[in-house]
Amino acid sequence: MRIGMGYDVHKLCENRKLILGGIEIPYELGLLGHSDADVLIHAIMDSLLGAAALGDIGKHFPDTDNKYKGISSMLLLKEVGKLLNENSYEIINIDATIIAQKPKMAPYIKDMIKNIASALCINENQVNIKATTEEGLGFTGEGLGISSQSICLINEK
């Protein structure tokens, strides 16, 4: 068995959609980034790639490549799932946390789990998503950005 850890952070800004776990969340600010800036999916991808010793998302989907500009991170997650399969790994479980002062994530978590499980061709009970705040502390607590952490367990087939 192999374990992987991922982390991502993006700045909140105007005139962008807020996409987390492939879900568009109604909010006056969105995340700034080359792709759709889905910090949850980016952290999950990095944890999976790390567990398989396949590098990180910057290696596979560089922000210097215009073909990834504005791309849905869910499409990239599917590619990561294919990479794991091609390298004879199966996902045991994923556990991730979204760190954001606002908006509240609870109404969207079930749909995020469905999206992630579907993209990776795994069962929903293999994916856990949580959300927390930093009690007004730091850049996420001040509402300047959103971050996410992910840990996963994979196994050779």
From Swiss-Prot:
Transmembrane segments: none
Reactions mediated catalytically: 4-CDP-2-C-methyl-D-erythritol 2-phosphate = 2-C-methyl-D-erythritol 2,4-cyclic diphosphate + CMP
Cofactor list: a divalent metal cation
Binding site for 4-CDP-2-C-methyl-D-erythritol 2-phosphate: 8-10, 34-35, 56-58, 61-65, 100-106, 132-135, 139
Keywords, comma-separated and alphabetical: Isoprene biosynthesis, Lyase, Metal-binding
Site (Transition state stabilizer): H34, T133
Subunit structure: Homotrimer.
Protein name listed in UniProt: 2-C-methyl-D-erythritol 2,4-cyclodiphosphate synthase
